[in-house]
């Protein structure tokens, strides 16, 4: 039997040069799993706690030796002798060992590393791909990539307030063609920006981070790049935005301060602006359009746009079934962003996806801005037949690692692989 004989964690670096946790799980059969934990820049108020050491003389306070020690000294002894294929039991033990609502005792970064490494070791023992281990033999849907090609907000040092402007190749016949389309548009955008004398350096997630005249100019420029690459905006390629508006929401006056444009908007005015942008550009998805605590604003946005635009809750739902249940009950949003480190275990992640689907919400599997070479989320996207993945531009190895893993999976699935394109938005009037 694949009993666990050792669980070992170490401190490694993520794509931003900040420390993160890597965990290795060893079994008596020789089956082995390794996982690296991602980290976010714009984080939701209700996310599970990422444990940092706080020692300013070491990695500017961002060290994770406390989380590493929690794995090696507290979690590891408790898992010895466990059957590594008992994912639910392992995750439940991790939750109980921590004993807090937000995983603040052991750290979500410690717990998640163990949860993912155990899943990899189990797949290794069974000699099947990770996506198949996690999702079974019906796991065959390749996701539509949501590719962040213009970065702003917390992800870039520029004057753009909206954090992410993305493209979605919904008209592609399969995943590899979708990736090709995205890559060609990315290169086309580079030449468009260059011709305008704009900066073509990339941000945390591989997208470009130019200074633009307005947030709308980002949409205009992307449409120009899509056409220059030879594709039809709206028909073959849709646009998506992640406003991450909690980052520019002012709690004191309850308004949205778009400092890049020098304007201040109320919730209703933000909704008006989104409605105007949707009428002018082929936008199919808006994430965190309003502050995570502005439930009235989110409800208004859902009433106005929820039938024709995917309204994704990231900071709003933080991959948490309690927050999602509240959203479903109040008619807020129609989609959830899934980030494994927001909740801390694979079991809880899959519970959130299941709840979303039962309620008719879509689920978008997502990276974080601080990523690694770990490609687990690619397997999760296929395992859950989620239909969408958000993992940055086709640039930077930490982003491309996920796309390359999806190419491998599509190859393995061969003629059984499915790519639903526009039909991934099954709850919209398309």
Curated annotation (Swiss-Prot):
Mg(2+) binds at residues 242, 287, 314. GO terms for molecular function: magnesium ion binding; phosphopyruvate hydratase activity. It is found in: Cytoplasm; Secreted; Cell surface. Its EC number is 4.2.1.11. Pfam families: Enolase_C, Enolase_N. GO terms for cellular component: cell surface; extracellular region; phosphopyruvate hydratase complex. SMART domains: Enolase_C, Enolase_N. It catalyses: (2R)-2-phosphoglycerate = phosphoenolpyruvate + H2O. Its main location: cytoplasm. The keyword Cytoplasm applies. It comes from the Bacteria. Binds a second Mg(2+) ion via substrate during catalysis. Pathway: Carbohydrate degradation; glycolysis; pyruvate from D-glyceraldehyde 3-phosphate: step 4/5. Keywords: Cytoplasm, Glycolysis, Lyase, Magnesium, Metal-binding, Secreted. It is an enzyme of class 4 (lyase). (2R)-2-phosphoglycerate binds at residues 163, 339, 368-369, 390. The active site is at 205 (proton donor), 339 (proton acceptor). The keyword Magnesium applies. Its cofactor is Mg(2+). Belongs to the enolase family. PANTHER family: ENOLASE. HAMAP family: Enolase. This is Enolase. The gene is eno.
């Amino acid at each position: 039997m694949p009993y666990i004989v050792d669980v070992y964690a170490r401190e490694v670096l993520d794509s931003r040069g900040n420390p993160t946790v890597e965990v290795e799980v060893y079994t008596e059969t020789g089956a082995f799993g390794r996982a690296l934990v991602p980290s976010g820049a714009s984080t939701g108020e209700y996310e599970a706690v990422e444990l940092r050491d706080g020692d300013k003389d070491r990695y500017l306070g961002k060290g994770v030796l406390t989380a590493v020690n929690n794995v090696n000294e507290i979690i590891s002894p408790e898992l010895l002798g466990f059957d590594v294929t008992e994912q639910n039991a392992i995750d439940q033990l991790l939750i109980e060992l921590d004993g807090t609502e937000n995983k603040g005792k052991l750290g979500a970064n410690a717990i998640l590393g163990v949860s993912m490494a155990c899943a990899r070791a189990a797949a290794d023992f069974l000699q099947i791909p990770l996506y198949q281990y996690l999702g079974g033999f019906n796991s065959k849907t390749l996701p539509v990539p949501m590719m962040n090609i213009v970065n702003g907000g917390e992800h870039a040092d520029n004057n753009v307030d909206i954090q992410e402007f993305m493209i979605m190749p919904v008209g592609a016949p399969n995943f590899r063609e979708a990736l090709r389309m995205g890559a060609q548009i990315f290169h086309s955008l580079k030449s468009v920006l260059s011709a305008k004398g704009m900066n073509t350096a990339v941000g945390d997630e591989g997208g470009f981070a130019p200074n633009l005249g307005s947030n709308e100019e980002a949409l205009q420029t992307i449409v120009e790049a899509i056409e220059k690459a030879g594709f039809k905006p709206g028909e073959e390629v849709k646009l998506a935005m992640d406003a991450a508006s909690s980052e520019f929401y002012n709690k004191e006056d309850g308004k949205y301060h778009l400092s890049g444009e020098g304007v201040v908007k109320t919730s209703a005015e933000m909704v008006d602006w989104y409605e105007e942008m949707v009428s002018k550009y082929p936008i199919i998805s808006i994430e965190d359009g309003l502050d995570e605590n502005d439930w009235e604003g989110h409800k208004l946005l859902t009433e106005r746009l929820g039938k024709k635009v995917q309204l994704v809750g990231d900071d709003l739902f933080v991959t948490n079934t309690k927050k999602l249940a509240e959203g479903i009950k109040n008619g807020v949003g129609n989609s959830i962003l899934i980030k494994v480190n927001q909740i801390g275990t694979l079991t809880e992640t899959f519970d959130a996806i299941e709840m979303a689907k039962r309620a008719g919400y879509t689920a978008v599997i997502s990276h974080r801005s601080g990523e690694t070479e770990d490609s687990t989320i690619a397997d999760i996207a296929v395992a859950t037949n989620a239909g969408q993945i958000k993992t940055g531009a086709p640039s930077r190895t930490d982003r491309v690692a996920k796309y390359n893993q999806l190419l491998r999976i599509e190859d393995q699935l061969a003629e059984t692989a499915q790519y639903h394109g526009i039909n991934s938005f099954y709850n919209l009037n398309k």
